């Protein structure tokens, strides 16, 4: 006996019956038995693609709106509409064939294709829009069926007494009542199971085919005749017309060539090209039936393109033939005033009646089934959270009965429109939007040039995809600008909602492939030989030992990069030769999650090395790509203090919402547990003074600027969710001391190191978090030059700042007493005294104790490794208890005074 996994053969819901849970890791139902696994039916091209596609495109519009289209649009406009519609769907068919032959399409149909191609945000939003299109289409078919029933069994508009078979009273509320009863029947059948349609589909196709044959041969048998047709409008105002059926007649054909848009007798609204096209296009919305069957076909790469194209060509031929028959045999009045014109002029009217009932009822039921399967797929993917969570529940046989109930309720709302023509425009707009999304998915895959995008169907290009997108969007606005604008606004709102929820998935993100493609292209264009000092910007490599003690520094350097490269580097001590696996690769997700938590724009580069020095050398050489490589190395300061654990201070880490979803497999507890505790008194140091100073020397030898950062743990939190950001207060200052304080009088304020220091301070002052801070530059002078010397020094420096376009307050600092403490030139063999260093430190405290951050000149490191400890001791004394301080040594020109 067939179960819920029996392949459907009608209306685009075929593979939706498959075991969707298998592809998503299990059902989301509560306690329901899992679906029994059965081998998929192996279908050929005819039964697997042609039959479902033909049935999907031969809906109620074929029988009840073909005359409406020809009557209002005329033969020429009608054929133009047909060509435009089939041109649009043909472009989309090419995209469908390409995507579907690049992998099996599972439950969800178009939603599955779009979501797995474009990612969860776009896929989820378009999937919901496509679901709404299916809901509205179901309403169209139900209203069309009721309309067909009323044509046979409805009382005459001018009579209140039943006559023969015409026993059903007519009116708006009666239409809603009858539609609700039909919809209830559809819902009950859908709750029982969808396998009924898998058995009946070929029989339905035979019935529809017999009806079509009777329509085509009727002009050869039925003789010309006249009719009296009465329509009742508001206030029981009745109008009777007397159209005629002429048989094949050249005069009739000539009269029906041009358009004659007039009032629609069912809605009493004026028709136009757009409104008629909207009704006609609903007959072209079943083209995805074959693509949805890819998992059930013997040879999907051959059957989907061949079957879909053959089915579309067949339906196009039938529609053209019917347009020609109606234009040649029925006068305009008959076409405008009777939707059931095929039944009125048929050799045996019940042929058409049976065809209408079979086509519309099966279409309505299968649209409901298709919509419920899309909703079920959305619920299983958990994109919209709790509102759709119940829709994931299934019966023991796998029938998503809750999704059916959801869909029934929404379709019931559409039935209050009361007329097929009223909601046909909405259906068309939603379907066009879905088709545009399919074309966009194929275009994105083609542009991304991913090696794994190798569809066996090759008759497409980015030109066809782009043309399909443009055609769909243009026709949307031609049909109804209001509906189109509203649908796009709804789509954007759904996109923003899903982007805000940031759902993670294993489907892959097409955006990443497109970004990679574009970044690669532009990186190749970024030629380091064309670098110019005018366009210099910081490209920073920040070495991080343990993020627990470095988060404030990471956030600070993020402000310092000025749109340049920012890389967090970390060296894992070890030797790959003696390790069973690389310990670095599993760490990347934790570091990237840390970057997300801090809200910084940084890359992460980790390496395995026997020593920190060798690892830093590796990173300085290989970090970056092309013209984007670090030009500045930032290190934490080397001293004997014990670091503080930032994770215990910032609410983002210590009070984070542990119920929030993980970030690509890394939740907050995992992130906290991954990084080791900070160093304490008993912990051995992985880095010795000689190695630390050697790293500074290596960076200078490699032409990298160097910055040493001290006391940045004193800065308040600046990560996402923090309530305070430093530099926001206009009273905060950035203090710059652009001279080598260890060699008084021997350094110029215009050397490379001083200018680099000024540039970095200016860059920080330009950052959004520090824009309101005041920049102060301290110029140290000796009073021996008297007042005129002081003024000359200040004027000279002010002129330099003017050329560099740096806005800053210049502070003149007399340091005669400090300078006298230097016994001679500061050399490696004769360093400055401890008293001098303490005096300079006191001078800095006196003038910069309230600064938010200080920029100091970093002296050259000693060439001898024996003097490394002495060098670090000097720096320690110089910056002791100052607060956040950056010691900077520049080796590259970074300023320009010319245009």
From Swiss-Prot:
Q: Which UniProt keywords apply?
A: Cell membrane, Glycoprotein, Lysosome, Membrane, Transmembrane, Transmembrane helix, Transport
Regions of this protein lying in the Cytoplasmic compartment: 1-42, 100-125, 197-201, 291-306, 372-373, 421, 511-563, 771-899
Family, as annotated: Belongs to the SLC12A transporter family.
Functional description taken from the UniProt entry = Seems to correspond to a subunit of a multimeric transport system and thus, additional subunits may be required for its function. May play a role in lysosomal ion flux and osmoregulation.
Membrane topology, as annotated: Multi-pass membrane protein
Stretches that traverse the bilayer: 43-63, 79-99, 126-146, 176-196, 202-222, 270-290, 307-327, 351-371, 374-394, 400-420, 422-442, 456-476, 488-510, 564-584, 750-770
Which parts of the sequence lie on the Extracellular side of the lipid bilayer?
64-78, 147-175, 223-269, 328-350, 395-399, 443-455, 477-487, 585-749
Q: Does the keyword Lipid metabolism apply?
A: no
> May I have one GO cellular component term?
lysosomal membrane
Q: Under which name does UniProt file this protein?
A: Solute carrier family 12 member 9
């Amino acid at each position: 006996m067939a179960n819920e996994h029996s392949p459907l053969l009608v209306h685009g819901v075929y593979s939706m019956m498959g075991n969707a849970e298998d592809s998503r890791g299990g059902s989301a139902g509560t306690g329901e038995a899992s679906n029994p696994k059965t081998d998929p039916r192996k279908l050929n091209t005819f039964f697997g693609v042609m039959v479902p596609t033909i049935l999907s495109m031969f809906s109620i519009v074929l029988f009840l709106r073909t005359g409406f289209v020809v009557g209002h649009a005329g033969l020429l406009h009608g054929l133009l509409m047909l060509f435009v519609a089939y041109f649009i769907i043909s472009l989309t068919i090419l995209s469908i064939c390409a995507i579907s032959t690049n992998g099996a399409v599972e439950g969800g149909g178009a939603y599955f294709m779009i979501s797995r191609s474009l990612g969860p945000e776009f896929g989820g939003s378009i999937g919901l829009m496509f679901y709404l299109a299916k809901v509205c289409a179901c309403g169209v078919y139900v209203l069309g069926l009721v309309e067909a029933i009323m044509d046979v069994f409805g009382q005459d508009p001018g009579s209140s007494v039943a006559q023969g078979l015409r026993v059903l009273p007519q009116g708006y509320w009666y239409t809603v009542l009858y539609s609700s009863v039909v919809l209830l029947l559809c819902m009950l059948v859908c709750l029982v199971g969808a396998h009924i349609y898998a058995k009946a589909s070929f029989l339905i196709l035979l019935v529809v085919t017999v009806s079509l044959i009777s329509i085509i041969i009727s002009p050869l048998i039925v003789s010309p005749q006249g009719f009296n047709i009465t329509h009742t409008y508001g206030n029981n105002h009745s109008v009777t017309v007397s159209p005629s059926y002429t048989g094949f007649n050249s005069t009739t054909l000539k009269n029906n060539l041009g358009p004659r848009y007039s009032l629609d007798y069912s809605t009493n609204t004026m028709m136009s090209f757009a409104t008629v096209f909207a009704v006609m296009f609903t007959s072209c919305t079943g083209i995805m039936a074959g693509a949805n069957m890819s998992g059930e076909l013997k040879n999907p790469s051959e059957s989907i393109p061949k079957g879909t194209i053959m089915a579309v060509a067949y339906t196009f031929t039938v529609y053209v033939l019917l347009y020609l028959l109606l234009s040649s045999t029925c006068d305009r009045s008959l076409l405008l005033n009777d939707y059931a014109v095929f039944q009125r002029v048929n050799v045996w009217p019940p042929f058409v009646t049976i065809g209408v009932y079979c086509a519309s009822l099966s279409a309505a039921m299968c649209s409901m089934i298709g919509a419920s399967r899309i909703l079920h797929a959305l619920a299983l993917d958990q994109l919209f959270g709790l509102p759709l969570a119940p829709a994931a529940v299934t019966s023991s046989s796998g029938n998503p009965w809750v999704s059916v109930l959801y869909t029934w309720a929404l379709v019931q709302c559409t039935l209050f429109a009361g007329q097929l023509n009223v909601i046909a425009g909405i259906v068309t707009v939603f379907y066009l939007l879905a088709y545009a999304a399919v074309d966009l998915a194929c275009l994105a895959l083609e542009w991304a040039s991913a090696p794994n995008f190798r569809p066996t169907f090759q008759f497409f290009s980015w030109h066809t995809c782009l043309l399909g997108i443009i055609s769909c969007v243009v026709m949307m606005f031609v049909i109804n600008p209001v509906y189109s604008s509203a649908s796009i606004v709804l789509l954007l709102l759904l996109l923003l909602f899903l982007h805000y929820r940031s759902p993670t998935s294993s489907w892959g993100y097409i955006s990443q492939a497109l970004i990679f493609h574009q970044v690669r292209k532009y990186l190749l264009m970024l030629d380091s030989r064309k670098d110019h000092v005018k366009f210099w910007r910081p490209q920073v490599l920040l070495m991080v030992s343990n993020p627990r003690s470095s988060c404030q520094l990471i956030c600070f350097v993020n402000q310092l990069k000025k749109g340049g490269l920012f890389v967090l580097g970390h060296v894992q001590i070890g030797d790959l030769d003696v390790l069973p696996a690389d310990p670095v690769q599993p760490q990347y997700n934790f570091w990237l999650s840390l970057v997300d938590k801090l809200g910084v724009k940084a890359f992460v580069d980790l390496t395995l090395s026997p020593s920190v020095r060798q690892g830093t050398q590796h990173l300085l050489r290989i970090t970056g790509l092309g013209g984007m490589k670090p030009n500045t190395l930032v290190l934490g300061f080397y001293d004997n203090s014990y670091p503080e654990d930032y994770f215990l201070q910032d609410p983002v880490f210590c009070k984070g919402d542990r119920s929030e979803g993980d970030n690509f497999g890394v939740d907050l507890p995992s992130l906290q547990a991954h990084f080791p505790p900070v160093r304490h008194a008993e912990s051995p140091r992985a880095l010795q003074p000689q190695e630390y100073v050697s790293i500074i020397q290596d960076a200078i030898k490699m032409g990298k600027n160097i910055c040493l950062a001290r006391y940045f743990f004193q800065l308040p939190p600046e990560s996402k969710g923090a309530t305070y950001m430093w530099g926001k207060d206009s009273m905060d200052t950035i203090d710059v001391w652009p001279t080598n304080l260890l060699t008084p009088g021997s350094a110029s304020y215009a050397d490379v190191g001083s200018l680099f220091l000024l540039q970095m301070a200016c860059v920080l002052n330009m950052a959004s978090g520090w824009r309101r801070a005041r920049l102060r530059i301290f110029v140290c002078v000796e009073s021996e030059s008297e007042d005129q010397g002081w003024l000359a020094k200040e004027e000279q420096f002010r002129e330099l700042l003017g050329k560099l376009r740096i806005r800053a307050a210049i502070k003149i600092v007399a340091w005669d007493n400090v300078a006298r403490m230097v016994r001679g030139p500061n050399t490696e063999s004769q360093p400055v005294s401890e008293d001098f260093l303490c005096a300079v430190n006191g001078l800095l405290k006196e003038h910069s104790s309230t600064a938010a951050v200080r920029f100091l000149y970093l002296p050259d490191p000693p060439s001898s490794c024996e003097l490394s400890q002495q060098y670090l001791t000097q720096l320690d004394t110089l910056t002791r208890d100052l607060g956040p301080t950056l010691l900077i040594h520049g080796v590259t020109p970074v300023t320009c005074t010319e245009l």
